[in-house]
């Protein structure tokens, strides 16, 4: 039984050393997402602009608030 466990551990150790650090950095840099916005961001921006415009549309109103 110990022999089987040692063989499993040897296999795991070999898998851990499969990639070099440079390979991992290359993989990580290749998977980056450009922009970083969520699909909800444009809708939230439009809603915020609408509320802002209809709540206090002028600087005179803003000062009165």
UniProtKB/Swiss-Prot annotation:
Modified residues (2,3-didehydrobutyrine): 38, 41
Sequence position, cross-link Beta-methyllanthionine (Thr-Cys): 58-61, 62-65
Crosslink feature (Lanthionine (Ser-Cys)) location: 52-56
GO cellular component, one term: extracellular region
2-oxobutanoic acid PTM sites in chain numbering: 37
Function statement: Lanthionine-containing peptide antibiotic (lantibiotic) active on Gram-positive bacteria. The bactericidal activity of lantibiotics is based on depolarization of energized bacterial cytoplasmic membranes, initiated by the formation of aqueous transmembrane pores. When present individually lacticin 3147 A2 exhibits weak activity towards L.lactis strain AM2 and L.lactis strain HP, and no activity towards L.lactis strain IFPL359, but when combined with lacticin 3147 A1 it displays strong activity towards all three strains.
Name the UniProt record assigns to this protein: Lantibiotic lacticin 3147 A2
Species classification: Bacteria, Bacillati, Bacillota, Bacilli, Lactobacillales
């Amino acid at each position: 039984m110990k022999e089987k466990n040692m063989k499993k551990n040897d296999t795991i150790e070999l898998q851990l050393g499969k990639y070099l650090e440079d390979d991992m950095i290359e993989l990580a840099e290749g998977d980056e997402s450009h922009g970083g916005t969520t699909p909800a961001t444009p809708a939230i921006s439009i809603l915020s602009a609408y509320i802002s415009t209809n709540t206090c549309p002028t600087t005179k109103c803003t000062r009165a608030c």
